[in-house]
Curated annotation (Swiss-Prot):
Residue ranges with Polar residues bias: 44-54
Domain of life: Eukaryota
Species, as recorded: Pongo abelii (Sumatran orangutan)
Coiled coil ranges: none
Protein name per the record: Neuronal regeneration-related protein
Major subcellular location class: cytoplasm
Record PTM text: Phosphorylated on Ser-59. Phosphorylation decreases stability and activity.
Length: 68
């Protein structure tokens, strides 16, 4: 492992944001671009699709591999 002292990061124990930065950062959750939300929804929809030939009652598996 190579150590690069110029890449070291100081971690402060103070809560973030501190008093100096309070006016610069929005309160609450940061806004998320609509493109990210749309992509996340597409991934969720694709993950919820059941494969063809499978039953929802059992775990999805490859239906064309049969033991002989």
């Amino acid at each position: 492992m190579v150590y690069y002292p110029e890449l070291s990061v100081w971690v402060s124990q103070e809560p973030f944001p501190n008093k100096d930065m309070e006016g610069r950062l929005p309160k609450g959750r940061l806004p998320v671009p609509k493109e990210v939300n749309r992509k996340k929804n597409d991934e969720t929809n694709a993950a919820s699709l059941t494969p063809l030939g499978s039953s929802e009652l059992r775990s999805p598996r490859i239906s064309y591999l049969h033991s002989f």
